[in-house]
């Protein structure tokens, strides 16, 4: 198994884990988002999951996410477009050149982005040992692929917003920590921290001083319900949804987000000061 197997076209089911619970999200035949939460300690978890799925389990692939701090990444801006074979050759060359780790101990993947002038190649690699340790957390469920957490977070934000804002900063927080990600033309900027969102934001703008036009925030329900929740700036826009955020992003791996139907799910875009009053910002 690699970080992502691009030839896999089975029914995708996004998975995330919180304590003993496993959260599953998938798209039905009408591209409507479906979800369920199950106790991950159940011995026969498949018998509980199967009635909800659109296809048989052996026709599904389960997608999880791994923290970017466990991976190595590099972005290349190349003068011309590469085909799949050339991309793979370029990845292998860069990994052998820059990492003191044998290729057979790594899983790697890449993303390609055509530019007006040139071609962007994003390379990600992870030790197989680290990936296997992450996969073991989900057992007895066997994941098919691991994507990067920052990729999943961006997809979830984009799907809920119904757009892919440029020069926007996306902030995510759960009990494990905080993550900031901003998609630029030349690179994807990512920063993780165990601090609060305000401190992470300050660290981010010091490291990446480019202009930020809008800031979007998602905090998991347990963070929002905490008595020690921090006050956020008035111009930050908070995303709220009844869907498990990471599982949603995982489910949308390699999916055309324009087709995703969230009409049956509760989502809201609020300013931090309006959250308790429930005022939704259009």
Regions found by a protein language model. Give the residues of each.
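Hydrophobic/aromatic-enriched cytosolic interaction surfaces used to assemble or bind macromolecules
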Residues: 1-282
